[in-house]
Each structure stands twice: as C-alpha cells, then as structure tokens.
Amino acid sequence: MRIEVWPDYGPQNSQPIFDAFIKSLRNAGDEVLINKKTKADVAVIWSVLWLGRMQQYRKIWDEYRNAGKPVIVLEVGGLRRNESFKIGINGINRRADFANQTFDDRRWPLFKHTLKPWNTTGDIIVICGQHDASEQWKGLPRMEQWIEEQITEIRKHTTRP
C-alpha cells in the first residue's frame, strides 16, 4: 500500500510518534512517502484541528476524504496526555474508526489508572468544550453559543454555579 505521511505540519511533540508510526508501516511492507503529494492510497496526519502549523492538514484531509480515501489521524491520548496516543481512521474521538471491534483487556492496566466513582456533589459545575476550529466541531454552533445553551440547560436542574 502507498501511504503519504505528513510529519512536517505536526506539532513539536508529534515527531517521535510519526517516527514510530513510519517505522511500523515500513516494517509491514508498506511504501511510505514522507511529506510528498503522490495520490497515495492513504494519508496520515496529526489531529483535525485546523490551526497554526496544522492548518495545512485541512487540504490533505479534504482531498483524501472527497476522493473517498482514508485518512489516518494521529493524536495525543485522552489519558496520560503526551504519554499515550490515539490512532483513528477518518477522524478522532467519536468520529473515528479505531479498528477495535475486537480487543482484549491487556492494555488498560498499562495506564496504571484507577477509575474513581462519579462525584455527584461539590460546589461548582465544570463545562468542558472543544476547540471550534476542529473538524470534530464541524456543523455545530460557535463554542460561545454552545456553552450558553449548556448553562441554560444545567440551570433547569441545579442552582450550583
């Protein structure tokens, strides 16, 4: 398989991850083309946040997705940030295919993380958002509007700040 990999536009912390990914592709016998536009079978980019250095990825994303070709997206992990990493097909988080239809339970202990019970008490409520320049936010309202909507909904259920 011919695979375009684009480390040049990734953030500073992405280079070792790209290097390891490129090595694994080559070890599998794939033809890897680095930072070269070649109309390959697959493209590999870092994140779907179209800001700063990474805004160059949007052209690659659009070209491959519009052609019906897959884009592999490398990204920092949600747990142990900058120690764990995600690899998704055609997106990240809920929009990605992680090819994990079958998996075992051997990876979870590697995180050395114990889940704590959900906290239903406390003095404040924290609303977490997403950067609205991300492909993940495509088609959704501006972040400011979304946060206002969440506050309105939460106030129907509690008086906590």
Explain the meaning of each model-derived region.
Residues V32, P70-I72, P161:
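Hydrophobic beta-strand scaffold residues
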Residues G52-Q56, Q136-P141:
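Glycine/threonine-rich flexible loop motifs
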Residues K138-P161:
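Donor-nucleotide binding loops and adjacent catalytic segments primarily
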Residues R26, R65-A67, R155-K156:
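Anion (oxyanion) recognition and catalysis
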Residues D30-E31, N35, R53-Y64, L110-T114:
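Short alpha-helical segments and helix-capping/turn motifs at coil-helix boundaries
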Residues K69-L140:
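A nucleotide-sugar donor-handling region in carbohydrate enzymes
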Residues M1-L51, A133-S134, E144-Q145, T159:
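N-terminal pre-catalytic "stem/leader" segment of glycosyltransferase-like enzymes
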Residues G52-L79, E148-E149:
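A short, gly/pro- and small-residue-rich
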